[in-house]
Amino acid sequence: VIGGDECNINEHRFLVALYDF
């Protein structure tokens, strides 16, 4: 899937931001 890695990275950063709280 083209662009799938980018989406995963964005989701990963989002989850990390949530856990950072």
From Swiss-Prot:
Post-translational changes noted in the entry: Glycosylated.
Domain (Peptidase S1): residue spans on this chain: 1-21
Top-level EC class: hydrolase
GO biological process: proteolysis
Subcellular localization: Secreted
Tissue: Expressed by the venom gland.
Subunit: Monomer.
Protein name: Thrombin-like enzyme jerdonobin
